[in-house]
């Protein structure tokens, strides 16, 4: 089968690899019909190479048709149309029972001290072959795959795999009161959906992003937008827009791809160095030096009102990043963050996705749909934010 594989920093290729097979009674094989490139895939493209091996199959936002199931998989059958959540969880351990599927005790990558295994996301998360391929072996398929309607385009359901529940969780974690103000830093795919969800729930939403195409897309869905490149002091501007109080909740949907700000020089050096050092040394650099650029997070902390909540959905990778602890403590700011617990939120989101009126605008996100053989070019376009690119869907 064809699969998108990692070959080095900014070097992904489409290779012919063996088709996956059932290995355990809880497995399923899914023929992929659509698979998206996630913003966090760019971390593999750029920074996290020390945890990858040449030939690793990427991708964690897939959906398709069930081809085969193991003996213990009974809730789906061959021919069903399913979305595959990006995290692999069992559904019956203590963590899953508590709605923390991203911390599943059955699939935790304990040797790396990490949570649940993820598709296509380095040795840190289990080195599980990913979904940017023609076929995917799905472990823990007795629980994970989400059966969806056979009707309608894939893009109506595809984003249930990751970014839509990630955005939903981010809004829930932001804890905005009825009629309150939600600010969203970063209007990439997760930020777009977070803003739309906030508006759907009745919040006033302010989105901050330097890219015109992203701001225009957000504005179509009732989100006020701010261009941070036109402003010297972003938190001060947000305070002015909110009567001097700040937002009740602020979402950082940017993560380590942000530019400038506190720690940026060290982070820029560390990110570049990971591509030049032996893997063992580069891993230590990532684990012990701040590799994140924290402008968005610092701005979020500055823009949130006293007693408010900062919700972090953007992915960060460093363990020694500087944080403004005095401001956090003095303002009594609450922080919530983490990998999305996809299955926890599906019962809330699926009816909205099924709704023909498309209240969350799931059909107005994808800007580029290309054959999987064009994945290398699509990665470059997505990373460079060129050609108005906001979201890429690959078709095997």
Specify the residue positions occupied by each region the protein language model found.
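NAD(P)H dinucleotide-binding glycine-rich loop of Rossmann-like/cofactor-binding domains
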Residues: 92-185, 360
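Residues in the short beta-alpha loop(s) of Rossmann-like NAD(P)-binding domains
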Residues: 211, 316, 341
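C-terminal hydrophobic helical "lid"/dimerization subdomain
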Residues: 298, 343-396
